[in-house]
A protein has these predicted regions:
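Feature recognizes metal-dependent phosphohydrolase scaffolds
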Residues: 2-234
Length: 234
């Protein structure tokens, strides 16, 4: 009886080992293209429509989008900004949705208060990590905004407790949505608080070990270092 059990375990071990080897082989055969994606399985490495990046350079302000494709190559679609407020269009290309942001060209930054009165309602979110689709769904489900990106939280406050960058493929869109909601919340008497997490600080200090490769490519196309994507003049 013991001998039969040992034989059974032996063959089970070899079967499992063969399955593991075949799976690893399939991954390499597919060009290592299988990857975890927090945006519902959408291939989101593309830089098409990425941006806009607002770049202060030589006393000029440039508004830059990236256009093109992996097959044809990428190029910059840019213009010089003359106004003190720029209307930018932010695209989430997997489902072709977009929203507009009125972006002031800041010359001075005012520090935020550290203490606020208790709001009538409060939502705390953290660790979105560039997952735009999940962030959008969470905000809609909790009544913070509607499906057209309009603030619906009244005088409520939303506290963003860090780590909204890194790992995901749509960090730019996430950051613009935060800024968009900050503006709308103020108009309604509400407030969005963005507290830096360790991943925001890592990026600003030049540690991009958790960032996806597309942002290194974006910085190269813009002619800047990756850390400068989040600099005070971007």
């Amino acid at each position: 009886m013991k001998r039969k059990i040992l034989i059974y375990l032996k063959y089970t071990f070899y079967c499992v080992l063969i399955i593991i080897i075949v799976c690893i082989g399939l991954l390499f055969y597919s060009g290592n293209s299988v990857k975890y994606n927090r945006n519902y399985g959408i291939n989101s490495d593309s830089l098409a429509g990425e941006g806009p990046y607002i770049v202060y350079q030589h006393d000029q302000v440039r508004q830059v989008y990236l256009k093109g494709s992996k097959a044809e190559g990428y190029a910059l679609d840019e213009k010089i900004v003359q106004d003190s407020v720029v209307e930018v269009h932010v695209n989430y290309y997997p489902d072709q949705s977009s929203f507009k942001v009125q972006l002031p060209i800041y010359k001075h930054y005012m520090p935020e208060a550290a203490v606020y009165p208790e709001p009538e309602k409060l939502l705390v979110i953290s660790d979105i990590e560039g997952g735009f689709a999940a962030f959008r769904s969470l905000l809609i489900a909790n009544g913070v905004m509607n499906e057209t990106y309009g603030w619906t939280f009244g005088k409520g406050h939303v506290a963003l407790a860090g780590d909204f960058v890194d790992r995901g493929y749509f960090v730019t869109q996430v950051l613009y949505l935060i800024f968009h909601l900050e503006q709308q919340a103020l108009q309604a008497g509400g407030k969005v608080h963005y507290i830096l997490g360790n991943h925001e600080i890592m990026n600003m200090q030049g540690d991009h070990s958790y960032a996806v490769g597309k942002y290194a490519y974006a910085a190269t196309l813009l002619g800047i270092q990756q850390a400068q994507l989040y600099a005070g003049d971007r």
